[in-house]
């Protein structure tokens, strides 16, 4: 049963819809942070600062901050509709990916009946749930209809531009989908007699919470639903904005009225109560998660995420941590992500009921940092102390789950890398090498990450050369072969053919070849004082590297920087792909040979190069593929 449920969760997590939501939310991070900090700077709780904003350049600074908020976090439904649909189009691996955002936005506006005639802006954060549902559904339908339309050859115009044919093939799917959503939206508005039904996200949740009041049961349900939505990539806090207004929007006003009347405040729960004591650092008590990550994480990339996310989490902006780790769709982290705010709700409630902390009587913007917000909300330092206690409780809850998540992450990454090595080995055998960085490769996202890691490792000097001795028939040391080695911090050592393929597809193979040539020459200089006889040092290169116009000039320039007397360099060409011997290539190789550089052909016989190449007399050495000679001993034929 556990294996089956794990398989189901894995399939869901790797589905195109889940991947699109994760990627879309990640791409939206710059706009979320821009909007959050604009809100913080616009509403920072300081009278002197607010006076400055009002009077500076006639209020231009305040208006600018309002504008930045409106076009980013204030238009969150629009931002996520674009990023998620674009991610879906890229995941679908078609040339029509750019049309997905257009179709999704048009479908959403058609469903809403346009932007006019509504009580509120249809791209506000409160509309996120509705917008994401319409976006995903329109993308799924568009993809399926495109597949069906591609079979209709009559839609193809011979001789016309490629983009024209794509547009024509997309015409009917786009019209059908947008018109369909327009009809459904119109039917809903007609049946309910209100345009508000269009925002069915708020409508559904308002009905769910309709019979609940702002008591402990209601607040706990609100916290759980909020974080379940967050876990599935939906901005839960904004989606339930209408619910929070219904449950406890008025509670602080009630408390303030009671205080003015000389009575004790009675309303315990409010939005400020949650923002101040439960949502520390944002959803899921992100600040506790980040601190736990800094304390317990053994992975450098996770610690870096924590360091990057920490400054924004201090102002309760959690997106970097939640989407970067990630927590969403990470079922190992689902338990602490939901459990932590539930526990903090209970501890904060008990503290207030026991009189340890005053009841919240002042509204505080959610962007006000920890400690300051606790003090301002309660008017007492006890509020700040409760925040610290809750923060510690959250850290203790998160620690064991972070350990478990990192273990699973390591095993999954290692498994994918081993699969990439198997795909490369199979491709070398068949003559069809895998394209790791192509969208159609099943582990494309992992390969992209690995290519970036490889490039960064090269820039930091973390790539190494190991040397394999070559002995003569008499047992004397004839030479050494330089072998590329890189120990990835998660996957361990990775097969060199995979690294070369990633560097080639990533566009930095030539930079890598110069890096390795420099490294080999430095090692050769270090070796010179310890040898008396001549020694041949072989350095592997590929035919793809030789295709660069400046390869030979740059290689010769590097080699001539080092004074080598006993160590002779050999450029060993690996026969992993076909090499075209042109007159220009022969002249370039001859120039290096005249400078004392030898050439060797490795793995000859794999089937890529012709035996006629040996007649050109440009190779000083030919190494046969092991498969040609492995069966010679004992073979009577």
Model-predicted regions and their roles:
Residues 2-12, 54-55, 59-62, 261-262, ...:
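Transmembrane alpha-helical segments and their short flanking loops
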Residues 2-10, 250-337:
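Helix-loop-helix junctions within the multi-pass membrane cores of secondary transporters/permeases
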Residues 3-25, 61-62, 156-168, 319-322:
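Cytosolic juxtamembrane amphipathic/interface segments immediately preceding
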Residues 10-153, 328, 342, 348:
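Early transmembrane hairpin of solute transport permeases
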Residues 96-97, 110-217:
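Membrane-interface helix-loop-helix junctions at boundaries between adjacent transmembrane segments
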Residues 431-502, 601:
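Active-site core of bacterial EAL-family cyclic-dinucleotide phosphodiesterase domains
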Residues 508-584:
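Catalytic core of bacterial c-di-GMP phosphodiesterases, primarily the EAL and HD-GYP domains
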Residues 558-632:
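The catalytic core of metal-dependent phosphodiesterases that act on cyclic dinucleotides
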